[in-house]
């Protein structure tokens, strides 16, 4: 249990990412100064946890000094491609907390193999704005399974977090809020209902975000009706993410940034570029400033002034997706029923 009495508890998955860090600091800024907050940082590795906690502490001192004595830090080591790791995280939270106020599902994983540079050049020449809004030149590996014999991207981005929520639902009951971070690129075209684990998909990351959209629309009403939990769906727009930097050199990185700013100048509302602006929708949702029956996007004007966009989603197939996830959940409940884990091992 938190050392801070009656503290507000927030769990942010993928906190060490650009978006995760900015969700954390914006949430701290958005909560009242008299609120004591326990921020549960998550990552797959202990060094990343230590680094992001240090970065958030520095931000608090520099930008929100009124929160210096109001924030307590905790951490979870969790890998959503490992069901035993998810079970371990559940045990830790269940031991330490009686209630969780905010859960941000921000952790995301792709199985990228690089960039089709010929395709990238052609896309940029033919339609530069589309090339940096809905790119098709990012190469993704096909058929990658996790150690649990599930589609790796499906497990990391959809089923792993879904199962995690299933396990900790009692901690979120009666007022807890869940914020799922989806993507601008989650069109129905990326998902085949004959391949829900995305093992045959050449766009498994985008397909996983389509699954997140459908899962939300198939569950948010029931969560609120039966458990008093409010669930929201958001996307951060387009911003500089650390995950793809390994495929860029200094020239291609600044070329990408130039095209981002050009797209924004030409009227794209989604090229936020800044991780801080990208975190607007996730935090606004957590603070009750968005609707549950739509997808809310972080957006900005040409000058970088942030605002929110509401997007309607085609929810056809949401019941089928939830049924599939629930069947898998029951299977893994059975597989893990005798599992005992040592939970704080880095």
UniProtKB/Swiss-Prot annotation:
Active site: 182 (proton donor), 205 (proton donor), 209 (lowers pka of active site tyr)
Subcellular location: Endoplasmic reticulum membrane; Lipid droplet
UniProt topology in membrane: Single-pass membrane protein
GO CC terms, sorted: endoplasmic reticulum membrane; lipid droplet
Protein's pathway: Steroid biosynthesis; zymosterol biosynthesis; zymosterol from lanosterol: step 5/6
Entry keywords, A to Z: Endoplasmic reticulum, Glycoprotein, Lipid biosynthesis, Lipid droplet, Lipid metabolism, Membrane, NADP, Oxidoreductase, Steroid biosynthesis, Transmembrane, Transmembrane helix
Reactions catalysed, as given in the entry: 3-dehydro-4alpha-methylzymosterol + NADPH + H(+) = 4alpha-methylzymosterol + NADP(+)
Entry-linked InterPro entries: Ergosterol_Biosynth_ERG27, NAD(P)-bd_dom_sf, SDR_fam
Family statement: Belongs to the short-chain dehydrogenases/reductases (SDR) family. ERG27 subfamily.
Protein name (database record): 3-keto-steroid reductase ERG27
Taxonomic lineage from the root: Eukaryota, Fungi, Dikarya, Ascomycota, Saccharomycotina
Gene: ERG27
């Amino acid at each position: 249990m938190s050392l801070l009495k009656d503290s507000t508890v927030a769990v942010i998955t993928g906190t060490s990412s650009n978006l995760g860090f900015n969700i954390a600091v914006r949430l701290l800024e958005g909560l009242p100064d008299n609120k004591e907050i326990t921020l549960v940082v998550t990552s797959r590795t202990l060094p990343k946890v230590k680094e992001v906690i240090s970065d958030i502490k520095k931000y608090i001192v520099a930008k929100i000094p009124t929160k210096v004595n109001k924030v307590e830090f905790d951490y979870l080591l969790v890998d959503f491609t490992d069901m035993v790791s998810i079970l371990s995280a559940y045990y830790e939270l269940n031991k330490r907390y009686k209630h969780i106020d905010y859960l941000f599902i921000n952790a995301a994983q792709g199985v990228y193999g690089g960039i089709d540079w010929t395709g990238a050049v052609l896309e940029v020449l033919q339609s530069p704005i589309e090339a940096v809004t809905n790119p098709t030149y990012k190469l993704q590996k096909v058929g990658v399974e996790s150690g649990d014999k599930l589609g790796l991207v499906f497990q990391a981005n959809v089923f792993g977090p879904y199962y995690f929520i299933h396990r900790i639902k009692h901690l979120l009951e009666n007022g807890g809020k869940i914020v799922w971070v989806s993507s601008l690129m989650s069109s129905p075209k990326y998902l085949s209902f004959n391949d829900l684990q995305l093992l045959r998909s050449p766009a498994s990351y985008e397909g996983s975000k389509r699954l997140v959209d459908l899962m939300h629309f198939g569950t948010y009403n029931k969560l609120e009706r039966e458990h008093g939990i409010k669930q929201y769906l958001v996307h951060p727009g387009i911003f500089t993410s650390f995950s793809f930097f390994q495929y860029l050199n200094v020239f291609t990185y600044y070329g990408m940034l130039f095209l981002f700013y050009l797209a924004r100048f030409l009227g794209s509302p989604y090229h936020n570029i800044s991780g801080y602006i990208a975190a607007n929708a996730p935090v606004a949702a957590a603070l009750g400033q968005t609707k549950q029956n739509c997808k809310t996007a972080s957006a900005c004007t040409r000058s970088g002034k942030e605002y929110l966009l509401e997007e309607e989603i085609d929810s056809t197939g949401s019941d089928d997706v939830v049924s599939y996830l629930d069947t898998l959940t029951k299977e893994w409940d059975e597989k893990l029923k005798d599992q005992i884990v040592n939970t704080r091992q880095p």
